[in-house]
Amino acid sequence: MSARDPEARPGSAGACPSGGGLGAISGPPAGWHRFTPAQTIVRTVSQLAVAVLTAWMIARLGIRWDYVADAPQQVADLVHRMFPPEWEFVGALVRPLIQTINIATLGTAVAIVLSIPVAVLAARNTSPNAVTYTIGRVIMVMSRSVDTLIWALMFIIVVGPGSLAGVLAVSMRSIGFVSKLFAEGIEEIDHGEVEAVAATGASRWQIILYAIAPQVRPVFAGVSIYRWDINIRESTVLGIVGAGGIGFVLNEAILGLEWSRVGLILVVILAVVVASEAVSAVFRKRLT
């Protein structure tokens, strides 16, 4: 086969007279094109604008660069103080650790119960009208726009410090997340089953119960387990603001400069988070 053979393929011996074994690249792949001068100017100006804006924002943060330069040494010193952990303190962490898990579990359960009606209102195919749809969406946005720690601070004012404030904070934060995914699951159902149940003369709530609920049950279960996993992590820090759990013990250890105890608490928190992630992954895998 000669180099002029029209059937020669790129990378073959006839198409690569210069040798090398990898084939000569005669040009850019199909679909590639060069930027025009105007496009190049626009891209360059855009990149410079982003760089300038980033530099301006960093300058406005008021960062103490002398602290930043000293940060590696401070981190090394802090780690040196925290390790080895104070293993003798493990027994004192059992109760606050269980309290943390309870806060996450109860908060998730409350959120699931409250998220179901919100999701029904916020789903286009189940919301009675535009007003209820808007109400459902507003509830979702309000819940997700406020961080869990801020919810905790608000509920501490209402019900006082302790686990109840933590449960309420976790549930209020979770409603927006859970109801949003619930609503998306409801909107993606097979409408053929809904029409079949509706043809029997079923009411709106009977349609939701017998045609919609069976289809979205796996989604509900998966989202609930995933949110519980997230809440385990969030509940570990609620005690810092007085909402109970292992975070309260962590805050006391930090204020008391008991760094070996802080190291132990961080190790325990890491173990709990990893365990909850593993449990969540197992249950989600079984549901899919």
Question: Which residues make up each language-model segment?
Answer:
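N-terminal, non-cleaved signal-anchor transmembrane helix
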Residues: 1-109, 116-117, 121, 125, ...
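C-terminal transmembrane helix and the adjacent membrane-cytosol boundary/short C-terminal tail
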Residues: 3, 16, 222, 263-288
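Alpha-helical membrane-interface segments at transmembrane helix boundaries
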Residues: 94-102, 136-143, 147, 229, ...
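Hydrophobic positions within alpha-helical transmembrane segments of bacterial inner-membrane proteins
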Residues: 108-116, 120, 124, 149, ...
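Cytoplasmic-entry segments and transmembrane alpha-helices of multi-pass inner-membrane transporters
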Residues: 118-152, 181-184
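Generic hydrophobic transmembrane alpha-helix motif, especially the helices
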Residues: 140-174
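Glycine-rich helix-loop "coupling/hinge" segments at transmembrane-helix boundaries
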Residues: 157, 232-269, 288
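Membrane-cytosol interface at the C-terminal ends of specific transmembrane alpha-helices
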Residues: 161-227, 278
